[in-house]
Amino acid sequence: MKVSKRNRIALSFLAVALSTGIIIGFIVNSVITHRVIYETQERVKEALNGARWIYTARMNEIDRGIYFTSVRYILRGAFEKEKVLLIKDDMERLIADYGLDFLTLVDKNGIVLLRFHNPGSSGDSLIKDPFIREALKNKGISGTQVLSRSELLKEGELLADRAAFNLIPTPREKPTEELTESSGMVLKSAHPILDANGKVLGALMGGVLLNRNYEIVDRIKSILFKDTKYNGKEIGTATVFLGDLRISTNVIDREGNRAAGTRAMKEVEEQVLEKGLPWMHRAFVVDDWYITAYEPIRDIQDKIVGMLYVGILENEPLPGLKPRVSGLLT
């Protein structure tokens, strides 16, 4: 059957119109998609500021507790009279009030007089510990530190066991021959104890172990992401890493468990841990893609020891979330 010239022209115009419509639709969709990704990434960057604030706030809370206790007359008096056990009950209240995992008193030479959380362990020297060294120089100090299993065992076997992980294979991780991790990351503070003349008598040191401690990451999720879910999955997540290992996280795996013991994507590890640069891109997190932000965590000697992460599920629905407390973000 022959098609008239008029019909051929009409069909040509129709084909051009359809093609143009498809192209325009593709361009519009691409522009919208990139805009949504850009806006989500900006929100994640802002959320990372909030996460850092929350992490630092917990550290400062511990530091205040140690400082105000170190200047109490009852502590100084017991120290001078060498009757440290008399203040044990007061120190145990401090441990409970500030959620401390360890609290230790040392003399002016760095010798442990008493571990209030583990009274059976004392008499060893902590003079090589950088926190103790600074405190005995009459300087207060707080920060992040990584402790080996042998160091953790001095604080208690239960604490050392809580720190230990069997590594769980994770897609896109950097290959490793290691099967376990036994070190622990702690938030820690130490302050000098002075006599009436300002002479250093010793130091008080305390802190919390972050391994399997979900207080900070859950606070980040609750404040910044409102605990919102999509198809049963948390939209906003947070993690504290020791190296590239998730030691505290609310990322959930396919079995419905926290993904502690899994590792970060290889590209993230190389940029953040090896180069010391933040990662502000999409990343594969355990079993899904997220719009993410990672930054290094450094110890008091400026060594990179881990990472702080926040992420928003990439396939979250529009219009999405905005952090609830932008006034906290700096």
Locate the predicted segments by residue.
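Membrane-interface helix-start motif
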Residues: 3, 313-330
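Extracytoplasmic/periplasmic sensor domains and loops in membrane signaling proteins
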Residues: 80-90, 111, 115-177, 213-227, ...
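Juxtamembrane extracytoplasmic/periplasmic/luminal helical "stalk" adjacent to the first N-terminal
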Residues: 5-101, 108, 139-149, 167-191, ...
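Short, hydrophobic beta-strand elements of compact beta-sandwich sensory domains
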Residues: 202-209, 291-318
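Short acidic/glycine-rich beta-turn/loop cap or linker motifs at sensory/regulatory domain boundaries
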Residues: 106-111, 197, 210, 242-247
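Amphipathic alpha-helical bundle/coiled-coil segments
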Residues: 52, 56, 129, 207-210, ...
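A short, hydrophobic, proline-anchored segment that marks a local hinge/packing element in signaling
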Residues: 167, 187-198, 209, 283-285, ...
